[in-house]
Regions:
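Conserved beta-strand positions in the central sheet of alpha/beta enzyme cores
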Residues: 34-37, 66, 89-90, 114, ...
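Active-site-adjacent beta->alpha loops and helix N-cap segments on the catalytic face
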Residues: 40-57, 71-78, 92-114, 160-176, ...
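Conserved, mostly hydrophobic/aromatic
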Residues: 25, 33, 80, 115, ...
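N-terminal beta-alpha supersecondary unit
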Residues: 1-46
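Catalytic cores of alpha/beta
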Residues: 59, 63-88, 170-207
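Active-site-adjacent loop and "lid" segments of alpha/beta metabolic enzymes
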Residues: 4, 10, 121-135, 163-165, ...
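Short, acidic/polar
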Residues: 14-26, 73-78, 133-144, 194
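Conserved anion-binding
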Residues: 1-11, 78-81, 85-161
């Protein structure tokens, strides 16, 4: 399922069998899966760990699974790893309490903890994208969280998400300018978009709607990156 611009009232369902979808993407060359528990993002606690477990089991060592949504306690993070996630993605909890990021990094290692910065009008927002975190401009949030040991940030331009209008390269360049590792999300709709993200220095990109609707073929992306 995908949302447009983080709006839960503008959701599109692409199927009822995420495990089958994951197997298909692995066959096409996927090496990682970004699994967001939208129910968990709204409720504040994981609701789809069984799905994470099923996907991780299905793809085995052919691809990693990173899990986000509702991971707002040490117990929730531990449960995500126990379900088979290789990495966790933290959002609202670390915007509200940056020390939570430090605790996660110290417990699990920086390589297994990514922080999602969902950006609207230059502000990092939380609570399933429904609220603005006071005083959390993107640059300020990165500075604080980097001080907590976070090394990788997943940056989503909410106004681009699910609309296939191309990534917000200006936003991404500004984050890359901090010297942190950046995974881009939002608006990625073509092979050229992926190559542009690689060329500005992003370490990864999250592909969604364009893949599900067939406008972008994963095999084409893999071939382009291997050239």
């Amino acid at each position: 399922m995908r949302l447009e611009q983080g709006d839960f009232s503008r959701e599109t369902r692409f199927g009822d069998d995420p495990v089958s979808v994951a197997r298909g993407f692995v066959a096409a060359g996927a090496t990682g899966f970004h699994v967001v528990d939208l129910d968990g993002a709204r409720s504040g606690e994981p609701r789809q760990l069984a799905t994470v477990r099923a996907i991780a089991s299905a793809v085995g060592d052919r691809a990693y699974v990173e899990s986000g949504g509702g991971l707002r306690s040490p117990e929730a993070i531990a449960a995500a790893f126990a379900a088979g996630a290789s990495r966790v993605v933290l959002g609202t909890a670390v915007l509200q309490d940056p020390s939570f990021a430090r605790q996660a990094v110290e417990t699990h290692g920086a390589a297994r903890v990514t922080v999602a910065l969902d950006v609207r009008d230059g502000q990092a927002v939380g609570e399933g994208w429904r609220e603005r975190a006071p005083g959390r401009e993107v640059s300020g949030a990165i500075e604080i969280l980097a001080g907590m040991g976070v090394k990788t940030f997943e940056v989503t331009a909410i106004d681009r998400d699910g609309l296939r209008g191309g990534p917000d390269l200006r936003l991404l360049r500004s984050v890359l300018g901090t010297g942190r590792s950046v995974i881009a999300s939002g608006g990625v709709a073509s092979v050229d978009d992926v190559l542009a993200l690689r060329d500005i220095g992003c370490v990864g990109a999250i592909l969604g709607r364009a893949l599900y609707e067939g406008d972008l073929l994963l095999a084409d992306v893999v071939r382009a990156l291997e050239r």
